[in-house]
Amino acid sequence: MLRLLLVRHGETLANQLGFWIGQGESEMTPEGLKSIDWLKEQLRSETFDGVFTSPSQRAVWTSLQLCVPHLISKEEIQQIEALREIDFGRFEGKNFKWVKAHEPDEIEKMLRERSKYVYPEGESLCTQHQRVARWLHEFIQKYEKGNFLICAHGGTIRCILSELLIGNETLHWRFKIDPASLTIVTLTEGYAVIETLNYKQNQV
C-alpha cells in the first residue's frame, strides 16, 4: 500500500490578507508557525520513507519543521518544481477585488473560461493540474508502497486529489484545504481512498 501524507504549508501573511500568492513568497504568520508546531506533534509517531516538497520557502520551511523529530536533514528532502502553486503571473500579490476594479474584463474571462483561464503572464489551472499529474504518475510508478510526506500548497494538493479520484481537474474546487492541514490518501493497486481530509488544529 502507498500512503501519501499531504500537508499544506502554514498560514502566510498573504493568506491572512486574502492576496494571491502562487509562485512568489510570503512570510509565515505567528499563527502559521504555531499550527505547524502542532502538526509536527501529530506526525511524530509516523515513519517517512521519503519527503517531497515544493521549492517555495513556505513549503520547504514546513517540511523541515515536520522532519525535525524524524532526524531527516534538508539534504534528504526532495524539492520538486512540479509541486509549486499555480503561477498567477502579473496578478501575483493581488486579489479578486483588485482585479475586478482594475481589469474587469479579466474577471469576466476568468468566470467564463474557468479551469482553462490563463492568468496574464502566468498559467491556467489546467496547466498546473497537468504538471502536478505528470509528476504524480511518475511518483506512483516509482513507489508502489511506502509512507511519504508531501508538503505543498492548497492548489497543488487539490490537483493531486482530483487526479487520483477522476483523472482530471474537474473536482479541484470540491476540496477545502486549509493552511497547516493534513490530508491522507492511500493507494492499493492504483485505487485511491481519502482517509483524512483537511485535518487541522482546533478542528470542530
Where are these regions (language model features)?
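Short active-site segment of divalent metal-dependent hydrolases/proteases
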Residues: 12, 156-157
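Phosphate-handling substructures
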Residues: 69-131, 186
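Surface-exposed helix-capping loop/turn segments at secondary-structure junctions
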Residues: 46-49, 140-148
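Active-site-proximal alpha-helix that buttresses catalytic centers in soluble enzyme cores
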Residues: 11-72
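Short basic (Lys/Arg) and small-residue
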Residues: 153
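Acidic, low-complexity terminal tails and accessory targeting/binding regions
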Residues: 2, 68, 86-98, 141-146, ...
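Conserved histidine-centered catalytic loops in small-molecule metabolism enzymes
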Residues: 46-82, 186-204
